[in-house]
A protein has these predicted regions:
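Residue-level preference for short coil/turn positions at secondary-structure junctions
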Residues: 4-5, 32, 62, 154, ...
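Metal-dependent amide/peptide-bond hydrolase catalytic core
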Residues: 71, 76-78, 83-300
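Catalytic-core environment of secreted peptidases
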Residues: 1-9, 67
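Structural motif
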Residues: 6, 39-41, 238-240
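Acidic/histidine-rich catalytic neighborhood of metal-dependent amide-processing enzymes
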Residues: 11-84, 298-299
Length: 300
């Protein structure tokens, strides 16, 4: 059967995967060495600084290895970074009957958006060497503005999400985006003349890409061994275009990977949709894999 609901696959299911894997160890294979910590945090999509970032910065956790919530058919060892910007385009509001007296912020924002979207054609030419990760890309996920139908919009705000492959330099990516926005704003010519646009760019999030550490091999090998046995097929080590909290551990020299319950792809999970789902058989099998992995690592 399947279980449906928002966050079922990303990542409530792994609360169960990890918790019941630990319970299995307690019941039938108590560890002879080491300790296990379960970190249930909720701020990954906002950078992770209030959850794992806070725990790490305060020295409240110092693990040797870590596994974060993921899917069942691959073990993820690298992932994209993410830059999010909020762009405020300020024009001058006016009555629609006398549009010449204002500056249309929406037209200006549209001009800037066209310049940003054109970047995606260039990003297609930039290829990552990490299997599972293709190229950078840009998305505008939210836009708001205007006050009424009969009013020339005086202000428009939109939010940009720029995914960065591991080979990219985040500072250079941000500088290039800001320059594109600035150049587009400067080149905008209001159809009826008028003042120039005022544009403000604010960074909302900068999450670095994750690159694998050599010390992750015990985790990778154990997951591939037991995953292959339980699922009956090879479990490859790949990168993912997502960004996660794992980078916060890896940036502090703690080897980490991503593995858990779920389908082969994010698309199959219907993540972020009302019909997000997980196959319960994947949940059961991933829990078995994690229990075996922990048993190996804690008894070696």
């Amino acid at each position: 059967g399947k279980m449906y609901g928002r966050a079922t696959a990303v990542s409530k299911c792994d609360f169960t995967t990890f918790a019941f894997a630990v319970r299995a160890l307690e019941a039938v294979a108590k560890p002879t060495r080491g300790q296990i910590e379960l970190h249930f945090t909720y701020d990954e999509e906002f950078g992770g600084d209030l959850g794992p970032g806070w725990l790490l910065s305060k020295g409240l956790t110092q693990p040797d290895l870590m596994v974060a919530a993921g899917f069942s058919y691959q073990v993820v060892t690298a992932h994209n970074g993410c830059l999010q910007l909020e762009v405020t385009v300020q024009g001058e509001m006016a009555h629609a009957a006398i549009p010449d007296s204002g500056i249309d912020a929406l037209q200006g924002a549209t001009h800037i958006l066209q310049a940003l979207y054109r970047l995606n054609a260039n990003y297609l030419k930039i290829k990552s060497k990490v299997e599972g990760i293709s190229h950078p890309y840009l998305n505008v996920g939210q836009i708001s503005g205007g006050t009424n139908t009969n009013v020339v919009p005086g202000k428009v705000v939109f939010k940009v999400d720029r995914r960065m492959i591991p080979e990219e330099n985040p500072a250079e990516v941000e500088a290039a985006l800001r320059q594109t926005i600035s150049d587009a704003a400067a080149s905008f010519q209001p159809p009826r003349g008028g003042k120039a646009l005022k544009v403000d760019v604010r960074r909302m999030l900068l999450a670095n890409a994750m690159v694998p550490l050599a010390g992750n091999q015990p985790l990778v090998q154990a997951i591939q061994k037991h995953g292959g046995e339980v699922f009956g097929e090879p479990i490859p080590a790949l990168g993912t275009p997502l960004y996660t909290d794992v980078r916060l551990y890896v940036e502090r020299g703690i080897p980490g990977v991503i593995y858990g319950a779920g389908p082969r792809t994010v698309l199959e999970s219907h993540a972020k949709r009302a019909d997000e789902r997980i196959d319960l058989q994947d949940l059961r099998r991933a829990t078995k894999v994690m229990a075996r992995v922990l048993a190996d690592l804690m008894s070696a």
